[in-house]
Amino acid sequence: MKPVCLIIGAGAGIGGNVAKKFASEGYHSYLCRRTDEEGLDKLINSITSKGGSASGSLINAIEDNSLEELILDIEKNIGPIEVVVYNLGAQTGMKSLDQTTHKEFEWGWKIASFGLFRVAKVLCPLMEDLSLIHI
């Protein structure tokens, strides 16, 4: 099994380029994004057509257990996750604090902060078992 680089928030910019780089270095790049399955497939094909190993799926990171189930599935069926790129952002626009609603702020927090916490909570013990990290 190849080590896995999990990219959560794999678009055409940073996430996609990180996926390409890790795949070129011998990793299996697993790409996730919330929408645009066609774009995701193009990104995966751009990696595999050059001999890299990649797969991916659409995921809504704020749904309960979505990230946790994804990580456990990858670990079981693809390989050990050695690298995670958490590249999600909440595009709520350039608003001042007084223009940002509570709902918009909460949504951004769920995506950016709470989602990363959930990833770390499930993945850190798995990485620690492989002596990849020390907590």
Residues of each region from the PLM?
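Conserved NAD(P)H cofactor-binding loop of Rossmann-fold oxidoreductase domains
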Residues: N87-M94
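Catalytic Tyr-X3-Lys loop
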Residues: D98-F117
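Conserved small/polar residues in nucleotide/adenosyl-binding loops
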Residues: I133-I135
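Amphipathic alpha-helical dimer-interface segment in Rossmann-like NAD(P)H-dependent oxidoreductases
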Residues: I111-D129
